[in-house]
Amino acid sequence: MTPTLVRQTPTSHAGTAPPPEPGARARDWSEIQERMLVPLYEAAYDRLDVGLGTRLLGLSCGSGLALLMAASRGAAISGIEPRSPQRLALARERLTPDHWSPHARGNTYLGSTLPPAREPYTLITAFDATALLDIDAVRLAERGAPVVLAGWGPPERCATSAVLRLADPLNGGWRPAHRDDLEEIAHRAGLKPDGSGRVACPFGYAGADSAVRGLLSTGLFDAAVEASGQDQVDKEIREALHPYVQPGGTVWMPNVFRYLIARVP
């Protein structure tokens, strides 16, 4: 995830089949793909004891699932999603007061830019670690506050890497994680590493159709679609998924993600 499954690069597309419109892609992200990272969110929140008293800012918050999980623990949440207005709209819909903890209702901000000045945040999450380089958010956290950065684990422990290699890394696509990616991003952001962990995040889908939709929703294949066409990219993804199709037709790909906790000096 450095670049990650949540990186989205708008492009034009070529090919015989038109690509899904952005709203459909965002819904596929929200309904299929985003939940694959729930174990990562839970591990980070458990380690940092997220709950009442936590003031959390989520960077590149997608359609808001990680924020919803923090709010259900009692955290006051804010999130920014500058890359996808469609995902941001879904986050706003998902994070209505009826859906989550009443403790956080009065403190919620969801937008495409940083929130207005308010009480410093006690936690910043960048489950797409590259978001920390795009957004000057560290200044909004209190001194000593943890910042969570996350990314893919070793390629040999991530079955999905066999599929993601079809994406073009030179055009916003995926590349294998390097050992010190997260530490390098933390250093560039002026943060001090203070612990790390690994989490199993298997990608499980009801079938190949669901898997293709979920993977395409990441935006990582946009350049490939532009170059080769939607039909060809769909075909190649299905071929790459074949070893992971189970007897009942479901798709199961074991993966490991890594997270780093860094501190605001």
Model segments located where?
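A short SAM/SAH-binding and catalytic strip from SAM-dependent methyltransferases
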Residues: 121-135, 153
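A short glycine-rich, Lys/Arg-flanked "PGG" loop and its adjoining helix->strand segment in the class I
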Residues: 133-146
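Conserved Class I S-adenosyl-L-methionine
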Residues: 2-9, 37, 63-65, 185-265
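Local beta-strand N-terminus motif with an aromatic residue
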Residues: 53, 120-121
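A generic alpha-to-beta junction signature in SAM-dependent methyltransferases
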Residues: 48-50, 71, 140-143, 245
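Conserved class I S-adenosyl-L-methionine
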Residues: 2-54, 84-100
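Conserved catalytic/acceptor-binding region of the Class I
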Residues: 144-206, 222
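Class I SAM-dependent methyltransferase SAM/SAH-binding core
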Residues: 55-115
